[in-house]
Amino acid sequence: MLVNIKQMLQHAKQHHYAVPHININNYEWAKAVLTAAQQAKSPIIVSTSEGALKYISGHQVVVPMVKGLVDALKITVPVALHLDHGSYEGCKAALQAGFSSIMFDGSHLPFQENFTKSKELIELAKQTNASVELEVGTLGGEEDGIVGQGELANIEECKQIATLKPDALAAGIGNIHGLYPDNWKGLNYELIEAIAKATNLPLVLHGGSGIPEADVKKAIGLGISKLNINTECQLAFAKAIREYVEAKKDLDTHNKGYDPRKLLKSPTQAIVDCCLEKMQLCGSTNKA
């Protein structure tokens, strides 16, 4: 059974930890993320972007796949299925398909349009008891072909969005998607604290991959209740595949090293290990 993110994020906010949000890209990813969550006894937000959703062949594959894995793996921790950086139409489609949570990314729109569409989606989400994450201030970096320059969120706009009572708020706080450059200025802690106090909402740290652990922990202490991870899992997966091939294990015909079940075993475990590390960092271990 899938749950929304409202209760898990409120608990995280009250007890000063963060719930990990891990983007999935295929079956192995979904299985690895759920396996790690069960091992760590951590609540988990299984997420997919619209690009990954298309790659996996759509809602009709992703929703039953995640639900089926929850049952087959006997997952007992809270699991939310979340749409990451959804468009207005994408959010509506995800809600109709059975996603338990959505993030509407209207940050690139004029603020009033973002506000109006956010309000409409919150009302729509209530019909299926789904949760809604909203965004103010574009995030830097690239996400599924959408490039953001990155900007610091406006406090007044955050306050206005908060009147809609979303379940979580993603705000531009100096974070970016993908790998952080050497000249990255870092997170704006004063802004995190100010937004947390002004909105009283669980805050979301997008682009959580590559931020120094001490910085993440400080941000969690100031009000971050959801940590988004994608790039680090991708890097771990790619590294394990490269090591397997460089060791020429795929050429071992005697042991059928070319079998995809063998080739993908260590990369899938690499995702599990990465997720376990992030759950420790979030402080979500043993919180389910």
Swiss-Prot record:
Query: What Gene Ontology biological process does one annotation of this record name?
Result: glycolytic process
Entry's cofactor comment? Binds 2 Zn(2+) ions per subunit. One is catalytic and the other provides a structural contribution.
Pathway(s) where this gene product acts:
Carbohydrate degradation; glycolysis; D-glyceraldehyde 3-phosphate and glycerone phosphate from D-glucose: step 4/4
Record's catalysed reaction(s): beta-D-fructose 1,6-bisphosphate = D-glyceraldehyde 3-phosphate + dihydroxyacetone phosphate
Top EC class, one word = lyase
Residues reported in the UniProt entry to bind dihydroxyacetone phosphate: G178, G207, G208, S209, N228, I229, N230, T231
Task: Give the binding site residues for Zn(2+) 2.
Answer: D105, E135
Subunit structure, per the record? Answer: Homodimer.
**Under which name does UniProt file this protein?**
Fructose-bisphosphate aldolase
The lineage, from the top, is:
Bacteria, Bacillati, Mycoplasmatota, Mycoplasmoidales, Mycoplasmoidaceae
Q: Gene encoding this chain? A: fba
